[in-house]
Amino acid sequence: MLLKNFSDFDYKALNNKVVIFGAGTIGRLTDLALRKNGIESQLFVDSDPRKQGKEVQNKKIISPDDLKRYDTENTHVFIACNYFSSIVPFLKKNKFKNFYKVTDILKKFDVYKLYNEIDMDMLF
C-alpha cells in the first residue's frame, strides 16, 4: 500500500473514521482544510506523550498505540507531520489501508490565512 494523495480520498468514506496523525500546527491546519472540504475528522494521533489525552480543536489526542484499536479497513489517516519515514511503516505494520499525504490539500488553500483561523490556544 502506497501513501495516497488527498485527491485519492473517497468522499464516500465520510461515514468512516477520519483521523489526523500529528496534533501540531500542520495537523491543526489539516483539520481546518478538511472541514472546509466538508470532511470532519474525529481525533488526532500524536506520539508526544505530553499531548496525549488532551484536546485540540475540540478533538481528543490519542497515542499511536491507541490507534491500533481502530478499524484498519475503514479508518482514514491523514499524516500531518514530518515523520513519514516512521509513521508509514507503523501504519502498514498495523494493517491500515487508507493513509494520505496532506500536502496537496493544504496547497488548495492560502496556508497563511488558514494559520490565522486555527486554534492556537494549545501550544506545546
Model-derived segments and spans:
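Hydrophobic, well-ordered beta-alpha structural blocks that scaffold small-molecule cofactor pockets
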Residues: 1-124
